[in-house]
Amino acid sequence: GLVGSEMCIRDRLYTIPNVPYDEVPEGFGAEDNVVEKMGGMETELPKDALPHWELAKKYDLIDFDLGVKITGAGFPVYKGKGARLQRALINFFLDEARASGYDEIMPPTVVNTASGYGTGQLPDKEGQMYHCEVDDLYLIPTAEVPVTNIYRDVILDEKQLPIKNCAYTQCFRREAGSYGKDVRGLNRLHEFSKVELVRIDKPEHSKQSHQEMLNDVEGLLQKLELPYRILRLCGGDMSFTAALCFDFEVYSEAQKRWLEVSSVSNFDTYQTNRLKCRYRNADKKTELCHTLNGSALALPRIVAALLENNQTPEGIRIPKALVPYCGFDMID
């Protein structure tokens, strides 16, 4: 009957990705992304510079084998100054977000199916999420899912906008890539820490919001003194749900490659349409909000870049901004 066909149409609609904005470059993959900006100084490393997985072993910071023993590949154990560096980064990122006007949320790391559909991870990423089938719950791939779903089925008042939230969570992803040099060490994990920024705004303000978020993320990389670049993603490399996306990458001198540390996306009304997240304008009419989010920042590759780019013959130097959070200025 009618309900059956409505559900059938809805299921079809769930498989259609967002429509890219006009300013999205055409292209199929990473090679078609456009470099918008380069920043930070490239570091001069000692001749025998080591990749982070060797530094982690040398200074007893991260144990990948222990993680394999306890869980499996892609679940490292952080130890001593390695663990303290993680915690320092999380607190630094959250404090910086708060200084930029974001309200901190500590959400569940497990969500129901409705939440997965609300932000568009389902059905698109069904096979890439850890699914607890007995309870029909999913481990989150990003804090974007629980935080944005706070506003599911909500009508906001215009003066509540923009909503700016930040959240630190563990994130879980099944698709930790295959084997090879790109997935060694911290490059790709099944479980990792991340601080996420989420914004909900009026449609006419979302472009401005996007720019502010890009500035927030760039500020973090500048304070961490890391060489970085900003990419405008082409249509083929953008996520299923994004209308416009910029990636931040940091340069790993020891690996001689760029590592992605953040994606900052505008979803237009793609998520709010699913979430039924609206606001009441001055004329008392309800309109769909726009959602945006970005990592500020994802930890594993930031740790990798910090270890690799700051190695000296004496040890690993901690950037000035992090010293008060770490309680030490060298790993030796």
Give the residues covered by each predicted segment.
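Single conserved hydrophobic/aromatic residue that forms the stacking wall/gate
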Residues: G1-G4, I9
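Short amphipathic coiled-coil heptad-repeat segments
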Residues: R10-E23
